[in-house]
Amino acid sequence: ERLVVLPLYPQYAAATTATVCDEVYRVLMGMRWQPSLQIIPHYESEPLYISALSNSLNLKIKELNWKPDLVVASYHGIPQKYFDKGDPYHCYCHKTTRLLTENFKDTEIKTTFQSRFGPEAWLKPYTDKTLEELPKQGKKNILVICPGFSSDCVETLEEISIQGKES
């Protein structure tokens, strides 16, 4: 009788969250019986989400046998033109990082964007370029987190775990 849709993208973007909603509506259009529908559009700043991120990051830092010079919060990128047209994703990513930073006053956290492809401009700064530049700035102990997904994303795991180390 009730359908709650929670897209696994904490930060709303038309290309992701709205696409999930479009598919839900498409399926519902073919149904005679309609459930009560609630869609959680974004939760980038929800206290429970920020707390879960903070706890996860804190545990990871404690597991390390080194102190990070910097934590890179790498979000999946979107084309710059989406932001220029008013997509709030970029703002939501920075909001998540800002709220996370409030729980780690002694740790610098930087927002970056990954997974760009094609010739057009994407949101910056780019994760791969940032990871290449940080050692030149004396930051060699870098921890990368990916708060743009609520569960592991194979593309992101490959990109950050393998390609990120190569940078």
Question: Which residues make up each language-model segment?
Answer:
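Extended amphipathic ligand-handling, pore-lining, and cofactor/metal-binding catalytic surfaces
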Residues: E1-S167
